[in-house]
Amino acid sequence: CWNGKKEWLFFMITIWVPKRLVEIDLYNVAAQSPAALAEMSEKSYRQRVAYAAQKIRDSRAKIVMLTGPSASGKTTSAHKVAEALEASGTPAHVISLDNFFKGAQYYPRLPDGTLDYENPDTLDMSLIRQCLSDLSTTGKTVLPIYDFTTESRSSETETLDLKGGVCIVEGIHALNPELTGLVKGDDVYRIYAGLREEYAIDGRRVINTQDIRLCRRTLRDAAARGRSPEKTLAMWDRVLDGETRYIKGFKTTADFLLDTSFTYELGLISRLLGIVRRQFTLEGHNAELWDETARRFEHVVPLDLELLPADSMLREFYGSAVK
């Protein structure tokens, strides 16, 4: 029942959250009060972030390793957790593993010859281990900066001093134990960010977390960069394969699962799907994949994008579509 807001919110901030199945009819009832639904969804996420920050403080760890699959919201969530730590008096810094890329010329390739962007060998693992070891022992290190325009490491660096605080290391390989091999166990706290809400009609699952993530990634690229969904859709199977090989196997090593689901997001996606389909021409398998995904949202009441708060995590994916 949507009136039981306190019970719902408590359920959604447990440390390890099983996936929950929400009836689309129940969502549609809640969508009749869109502002209240959006407020509840946003409040629930903020409470989950605050709880994650509390668990980090309780652990006394200096280094937080935060990962999640593509479009799980891990990057923005890392910054949200850092903000929550700062608000409670704990200095916090976010480190992106993207800055440890070796460079395009060093990327491994898949059997078909294409670049394997998901492979951990794209990263300078030895440098990551050294930087994390420095932070663990001295609280200081020098970080590389990656230049995405040239796809190579910049000559510039960044000096980081934790000043008694915490660093949050975010990236798809953050839970890979090779990264923290030189850091003592008590100094590391591990978080897996992922969606935990799926949707059903008469008990039959019709929208799963992969569907939501595909929409997030595709709609973000279309709205923010004017990019056709063709490239995103064409890469999707490869992305999922990389997650299976390199990310999900370490999920059970996490100390905390940060749920990045927003119930009202369902209506935002429903609003945007048709717009993107009319804006771009899709063909072949990509058209079939997108149309099949769109059909899953046929019974979802759409919501206005203006419901998105300025500081919402979802702005990472839909902010550019808000007029």
Residue spans for each PLM region:
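Conserved lysine of the Walker
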Residues: 74
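Glycine-rich phosphate-binding loop used to anchor ATP phosphates in small-molecule kinases
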Residues: 58-60, 129-187, 232-250, 265
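Post-Walker A helix-loop "phosphate-sensing" segment adjacent to the P-loop in P-loop NTPases
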Residues: 83-93
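Hydrophobic positions on the alpha1 helix immediately C-terminal to the Walker A/P-loop
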Residues: 77, 81
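Conserved NTP phosphate-binding and transfer environment spanning the P-loop NTPase/kinase superfamily
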Residues: 13-14, 34, 39, 180-323
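Charged, amphipathic alpha-helical linker segments immediately N-terminal to NTP-binding catalytic cores
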Residues: 12-50
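Conserved nucleotide-sensing/catalytic segment adjacent to the nucleotide-binding pocket
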Residues: 93-95, 102-149
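Hydrophobic anchor at the beta1->P-loop junction of P-loop NTPases
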Residues: 64-66
